[in-house]
């Protein structure tokens, strides 16, 4: 694993990581082209061609757009950020950002707790995103084509675009080099 934009603080024990993003950290390419940044701390690795990554994401939702995410990155203009984020209304939201030069930001389900489970699966050039409240029953959020000819990196991100910092806990982490068979069932 390697850092892209090192975290303000980081610790890891057993199957848990805590990552702290400093102020004004984000990864976004605004459709209005007024805000383009990629300074959020990311802990990344090179995944297999086909894989399933699962992790629970938990944080305190202190400031607008504070978030923790699973990230799949091809380069600075092509990436997916699957984020558990405090949205513009103050809600805790499942958010997926697919960037192919410009970010396509999709605000999905509102979550009532500070913790949710995420799953990102890759099968060839198809990426599927899921969430779960308990890590057992998975709900499909997004199913898309993503050009994956170049070397990809996969990992974890913390962000605090408007706040002073955001401390994110990633736990229940599971990585399998496996091709998903049924995108609707998540296995």
Where are the language model's segments positioned?
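Extracellular glycan-recognition regions
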Residues: 1-187
